[in-house]
């Protein structure tokens, strides 16, 4: 499994991330690194799971290109905008997240608002099987059905 935030946090630790501008720069570098890793692993026949906040209209083409002939499936976790903001505030206030994300910076909050308003967190156009999971109160469908979906679509 490749988690985008783990890659970004490693870059933050190595290169420093004193402000939101640097965080955004490292975010772009992280996606470039993520796509490179995906391409290399998939071309070598390695199966993988990628955890990232891909954006409709931005990530679709890149993912299709790096996937090549690999079989892919998409699981989109979704909740209301209000719940996204509640979870975001809770996470930012917890102090558990890497400080390089600058979660409390006004620019970070504005970016989240723009992202939600732009409806970018909808299914990507990948021509692949899709499962939308409502995470408002647990997982609907539940974990067993999510695993079965992934298993069945990638056989």
Model-predicted segments: where are they?
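Conserved substrate/cofactor phosphate-moiety recognition/catalytic segment
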Residues: 1-44
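Short, electropositive alpha-helical surface patch
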Residues: 55-70
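Small-molecule kinase domains that catalyze NTP-dependent phosphoryl transfer to phosphate-bearing small molecules
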Residues: 93-144
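C-terminal accessory "lid"/substrate-recognition subdomains
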Residues: 144-155
């Amino acid at each position: 499994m490749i988690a985008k935030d783990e890659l970004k946090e490693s870059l933050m630790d190595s290169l420093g991330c004193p402000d939101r501008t640097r965080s955004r720069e490292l975010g772009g570098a992280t996606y470039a690194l993520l796509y490179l890793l995906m391409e290399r692993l998939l071309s070598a026949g390695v199966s993988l799971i990628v955890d990232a906040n891909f954006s409709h209209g931005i990530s679709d083409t890149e993912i299709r290109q790096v996937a090549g002939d690999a079989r892919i499936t998409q699981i989109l976790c979704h909740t209301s905008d209000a719940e996204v903001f509640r979870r975001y505030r809770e996470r930012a206030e917890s102090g558990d997240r890497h400080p390089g994300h600058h979660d409390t910076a006004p620019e970070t909050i504005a970016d989240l608002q723009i992202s939600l308003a732009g409806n970018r967190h909808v299914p990507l156009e990948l021509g692949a099987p899709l499962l939308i999971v409502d995470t408002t109160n647990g997982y609907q469908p539940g974990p067993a059905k999510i695993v079965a979906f992934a298993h069945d679509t990638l056989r």
